[in-house]
């Protein structure tokens, strides 16, 4: 889920291959040296060494796409047209992109090509097609957030994450679907309808960034923006077989000028903006771009993107699963496979019990539910569907109702949980955990009953939602297919150590491969 206010809710693989350049200088926090070359030296003509990556343009990674455009191997216009063609070919059956921005995307692509022809500096994502989730402000457009009644909430300016992506030269080709108020783990709403999973229409694409996950998995855009307050980046990444990072709280700035009220404090402390992509290197590149300062977010933290490297082989804690969680054999096998990939990559993996995952999850559930009940519930229920009500009631049923004293005790308990995890990371810098222990549910399972909601959130994705209350970074990378459906694993690290999570994710990806390549064979 990714939550925002009821009146208007707002709700990275190691360094990429280095291109030859004597002037390529890695600034602090730099991660994509292939992309850095464009900032320092842009070629106005086609480079003698310009090469197009193999395969259709829409299948290229963001890193390769950016490099091809910089070198002149392809124009931004041709690139955007290829992605728009892909969108027209597959989106009608997926309903992942719900706002088509083809016209302005082509206009931006022409401008990008003119800018390159003039020479000079180019952004890290110059000419690269992306999508934005329809729950952050996009200047001049309603921020519907899945709710028809939000038609009058017109964005006065781009949200920080949109602005940062555009500043880097990215071209937005469409806005992706989200459930009402981005509050469900399943992507469906009365305004745009149900979004389908490109692997299998009988399983959910996840939520709330389900449109984002479905789109980028299917080849619509190279990077998809999303956000996460209870798993809304990591759950769709798992369901759609793509990679993501939920950054540390404060890493990426967030603000919606269309909102009529400020977000409650805990919503700030538990939520994060972030990217989904088919390649871990693309997630890392997008994280750098998205993380740039914006003065509108007082919670933004100027933390370096790369921290000190741990001494010796990195110890990974393979999280022991609580006894009350029924682990599907395919999930258990995927976790063992991921652990083996890490071991073969030089990590040292041990099965260890992590600090009080059950207590952490319950603290998350209690805080987010009670804050919503006080600040937003009444207004939300007036403008939402019966499906929303059913899903919300299921979550409420698992939460403890808190009075003021109990609320203060819960927020204090949060500090203790964070401290315990930070101390744990001193011994084990990386935690390998499941995204879910259960098979991926159906596309509308949270509307069946309150019990089914609890089965999904408490019984299935407990290790996802719990991390939000800790404010920790969590990456997801796909590991395997079971009966044609993707299974991902989660990598959790200390505060502002997204680099460690993404390094581990890249090590797994290097051995597991990019699952989306197998998806396309079945779609076309």
From Swiss-Prot:
Pathway: Plant hormone metabolism; auxin biosynthesis. Pfam families: Amidase (PF01425). Its EC number is 3.5.1.-. Residues 1-56 are annotated as: Disordered. It is an enzyme of class 3 (hydrolase). It comes from the Bacteria. One of its GO terms (biological process) is auxin biosynthetic process. GO terms for molecular function: hydrolase activity. Keywords: Auxin biosynthesis, Hydrolase. The active site is at residues 133, 208, 232. Residues 1-26, 34-54 have a biased composition (Basic residues). Hydrolyzes indole-3-acetamide (IAM) into indole-3-acetic acid (IAA). Belongs to the amidase family. This is Indoleacetamide hydrolase. It comes from Bradyrhizobium diazoefficiens (strain JCM 10833 / BCRC 13528 / IAM 13628 / NBRC 14792 / USDA 110).
């Amino acid at each position: 889920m990714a939550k925002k206010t009821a009146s208007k809710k707002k709700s990275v693989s190691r360094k990429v291959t280095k291109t030859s350049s004597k002037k390529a200088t890695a600034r602090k926090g730099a991660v994509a040296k292939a992309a850095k070359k464009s900032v320092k030296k842009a070629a106005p003509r086609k480079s003698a060494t310009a090469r197009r990556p193999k395969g259709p343009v829409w299948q290229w990674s963001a890193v390769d796409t950016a490099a091809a455009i910089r070198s002149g191997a392809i124009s931004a216009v041709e690139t955007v047209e290829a992605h728009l063609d892909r969108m027209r070919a597959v989106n009608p059956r997926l309903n992942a992109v719900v706002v088509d921005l083809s016209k302005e995307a082509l206009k931006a692509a022409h401008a990008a090509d003119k800018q390159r022809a003039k020479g000079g500096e180019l952004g890290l994502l110059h000419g690269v097609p992306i999508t934005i989730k329809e729950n952050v402000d996009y200047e001049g457009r309603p921020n519907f957030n899945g709710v028809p009644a939000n038609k009058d909430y017109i964005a006065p300016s781009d949200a920080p994450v949109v602005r940062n992506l555009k500043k880097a030269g990215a071209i937005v080709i469409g806005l992706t679907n989200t459930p009402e108020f981005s509050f469900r783990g399943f992507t469906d709403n009365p305004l745009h309808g149900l979004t389908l999973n490109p692997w299998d229409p009988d399983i959910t694409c996840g939520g709330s960034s389900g449109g984002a996950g479905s789109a980028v998995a299917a080849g619509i855009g190279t990077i998809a923006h999303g956000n996460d307050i209870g798993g809304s980046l990591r759950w769709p990444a798992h369901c759609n077989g793509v990679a993501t990072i939920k950054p540390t709280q404060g890493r990426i700035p967030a603000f919606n000028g269309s909102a009529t009220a400020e977000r409650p404090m805990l919503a700030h402390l538990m939520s994060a903006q972030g990217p989904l992509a088919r390649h871990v290197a693309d997630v890392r590149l997008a994280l750098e771009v998205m993380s740039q300062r914006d003065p509108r977010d007082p919670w933004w933290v100027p933390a370096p993107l790369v921290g000190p490297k741990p001494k010796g082989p990195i110890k990974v804690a393979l999280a022991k699963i609580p006894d009350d969680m029924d682990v599907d054999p395919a999930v258990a096998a995927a976790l063992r496979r991921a652990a083996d990939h890490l071991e073969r990559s030089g990590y040292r993996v041990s099965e260890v019990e992590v600090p009080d995952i059950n207590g952490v999850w319950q603290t998350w559930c209690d805080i987010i539910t009670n804050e919503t009940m006080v600040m937003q519930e009444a207004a939300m229920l007036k403008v939402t569907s019966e499906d929303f009500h059913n899903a919300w009631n299921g979550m409420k049923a698992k939460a403890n109702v808190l009075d003021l004293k109990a609320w203060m005790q819960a927020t204090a308990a949060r500090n203790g949980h964070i401290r315990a995890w930070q101390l744990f990371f001193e011994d084990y810098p990386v935690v390998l955990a499941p995204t879910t222990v259960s098979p991926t549910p159906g596309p509308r399972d949270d509307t069946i009953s309150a019990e089914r909601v609890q089965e999904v959130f408490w019984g299935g994705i407990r290790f996802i939602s719990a991390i939000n209350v800790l404010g920790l970074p969590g990456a997801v990378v796909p590991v395997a297919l079971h009966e044609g459906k993707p299974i991902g694993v989660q990598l959790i690290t200390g505060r502002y150590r997204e680099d460690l999570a993404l390094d581990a994710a890249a090590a797994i990806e290097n051995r597991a491969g990019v699952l989306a390549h197998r998806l396309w064979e079945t779609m076309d």
